[in-house]
Amino acid sequence: MATALATMTAPVRFDFQNNNVEVMTLDTLRRTHKENDIYGNPVKGIYHYEVIERMTDICKKYNLNYEVEEIFAAQNKNKAQPGVVVLPQVEEKYGENAVEAHVLRRVYATIRIKNWETDELTTTLVVAFHQDGIQAAIGPCVLVCHNQCILSPERSVSNYGKDKVTTEELFGRVDGWLSNFEEQMNEDRERIRRLKEKKISAVEMYAYIGLLTALRVSHDSSDKRFSSKVETYPLNQSQISVFTEDLLKLAEEKQTLTAWDVYNCATELYKPGKTDLPAMIPQNGALAEVLLSDRLN
């Protein structure tokens, strides 16, 4: 028992000097430094670990079989408000790079819901906590590669941006998803079936690559006629290059491509360390919208 206790309470250290992303447990996240305002309250009104706890409470409310699967924290290049800050005065107490000395402003967590899980798919509730605010989304997750699917605009919510809600309304939206879990899960799996049945010719494959490029260019254009039409692009330019190469390789290996293959090539990029945390959820949803619609017609 003493050995087990020693292991559980052993100090944990982060190394964001060499790692852009660190993985941790919920207990470790709770131990990180709490960022408060001048009144001693959480800067975002709620701590990152409390957001995850609220999500798990909703899972419990509906007797769902869940586990907090992965928690990531990421650094970013924002010098004014970096994703990770190390406090030297706290290091003096706990040691160099101690967990307790870290302020984590960019956290991404996945909560796996195992009800009606298959050999191919589970369902994941994802949470992003960062400098802009809080995001949540739900959808199927491909077990073999951990590729997250967000297959409808109704499956994501945030407390900032164009369609922002309050933090409590965000939790209310999640409650709505989980209260109708089986029905919404079946709707998403039907969308996957449609993607799998949608054959993609070589011409269509190149058309999708061109469309994704056009959406990116339009979004970033200084011409409002174009930028006003694209709120979120599915892939940025560097991602389009990686996606295109991966898709071309897949086309060499498979006789027939489907829209599901195209989607999975892109969702491989929507992971911490590959996509900026605040962009992971909206880009994923934007891509599904393109593939499930008839944008090429």
Please annotate each region the language model reported.
Residues M1-E53, Y62-N63, E67, F72-N76, ...:
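Feature for intrinsically disordered/low-complexity regulatory segments and propeptides
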Residues M1-F14, P88-N297:
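Intrinsically disordered, low-complexity regions enriched in serine/threonine
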Residues T56-D57:
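Compact, well-ordered interaction domains used in eukaryotic information-processing assemblies
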Residues K60-V103:
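A short acidic/basic microdomain associated with nuclease active sites
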